Amino acid sequence: MDIEKLLAANPAMTDIHLTEGLPLMIRVYGALKKMKEIAEPQLFAELISSYVPPDRQAAYQRTGSADSAFSLGNVRCRLHLYRSGGLASAAIRILPELSLLGADLDRTWLEKVSQLSHGLVLITGSSGSGKSTTMARILSLISQKRACHVVTLEDPVEYVIPMEKALIHQREIGRDVADFPQGIRDALREDPDVIALGEMRDSETISAALTAAETGHLVLGTLHTTRAKDVPARIIHAFPGDRQEEIRGLLAANLVTVSSQMLYRSGKETWLLREILTNVAAVAHLIREGKEEQIPSYMEMGLSQMRTMKQAMYAMKGISERERERLLKSLE
């Protein structure tokens, strides 16, 4: 299998799926397409030897799954190896170079985030919604414009951020540090200005991230939630009841903004939909008082760049009314 040749023949390809003994499948414009080539056992051996570090090879043998990332020219690829029915399988996500992607229509929001000196910024959405790309855009802006120290914690490192004005250390879980909480504790001893977390998976990581934000650092993180309004509750309820009041206070004081996004595909067109929550004084009060259900009413007012997903949908350009109606139903 030659990934570069596959990309040349299918420039819109976003994913490659491999199952031992079966034809390759690629995802193009959101749909899977069967190829003629068969995924032979040797292909998996080559993937593992070429792109998976020894420690992760051992993890694959022990647990049946492993993650890695690698570069092919201007393209980064994220590799997930797993077994299914006793057969070797793999999913490869194509991460195109940021400069080759179209402009993000929320450039103003991205630039404001990149200029923040402290606080917690969350990027949320389902798998494949572009969270990593949004994070990379923000980090690239920081690198271009700020003489600061950025520490990222990723599993694995996806986009490699060029060092321009900023000093950047991209640490990979398993390779460079044991886990996210340990990485945050380490980062606080590394004189960071910005800490970026590939994923906030558990209460220990969330707690460490809030502490880092409270101590004067800019913390960027991602969460698997689909709507911005649900983020405060998602974070608070990750903790036992006796800590929730404390976490409410920390979140209300340190959260700056949330971007929740989704990709909508129709034919060969793809739209990024993003709703934005800004932690203005009224929103912080709602979080502190446990009244998160009232947050959408403030988002709908459009203050401080806030908007709901429905408002983002109505602002979409180049989409037919039929498509808009179909998208509206998917949001309900």
Annotate each PLM feature.
Residues M1-E332:
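Short, flexible helix-loop junctions that flank or precede catalytic/ligand sites
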